[in-house]
């Protein structure tokens, strides 16, 4: 089953990725306009661009996370060396996320007035080009490690959902609080605990010398990513506590009748 799915997905050429992402950026704005019009709500030009960007990012995150989980779960079928083993499915996943980074970077540049953000551009260049394209697709190494890093993607839908709810003025809705707690949980469990432990185990148990560029990228980026994840987790928890305190103070107090 694993080999069948892998062989099917790998048959998708780069043209398939180009058509896939192009179609998303074409039909999502039209769909958004229709949904907002049917609900008698206005959707500005800037909002439409931002909604489209975040919806595509959410779809990409869900697909990347799901396929990475499946590939990691079946690692006994393809991993003989945790540092060097690759398979058709891992190759497909890295191509999928790399094309997302490319299209998202282009989207940020084309609509720079609404979206441009230097940290995101730098992230796409460092993570997308150096890690996934160079190490994963060109150098053909550490696929398992890169798949573990892609588990970080599970937090992105909750980050974007927070923005969606905020834009819809639903900050006081119960969904906003639930989304915040789920986001904090996955930040702590996946980004701060699970993935770092797994990646460290790979390098302790089966370290294989890579070339100088790959070694520099991995040993320079991993500590930075870990520190950033801890900092972002702090901001997430701080935001939740702030929201809870604001909600508590805004709740009308009912006076007891004597």
Curated annotation (Swiss-Prot):
SMART domains: TLC. It comes from Dictyostelium discoideum (Social amoeba). The chain crosses the membrane at residues 8-28, 49-71, 92-112, 118-138, 144-164, 170-190, 217-237. GO terms for cellular component: endoplasmic reticulum; membrane. It holds the Pfam family TRAM_LAG1_CLN8. It comes from the Eukaryota. Belongs to the TLCD4 family. PANTHER family: CT120 PROTEIN, TOPOISOMERASE I DAMAGE AFFECTED PROTEIN 4. It is a multi-pass membrane protein. InterPro entries: TLC-dom, TLCD. Keywords: Membrane, Transmembrane, Transmembrane helix. It is found in: Membrane. GO terms for biological process: lipid homeostasis. This is TLC domain-containing protein 4 A. Residues 46-245 form the TLC domain.
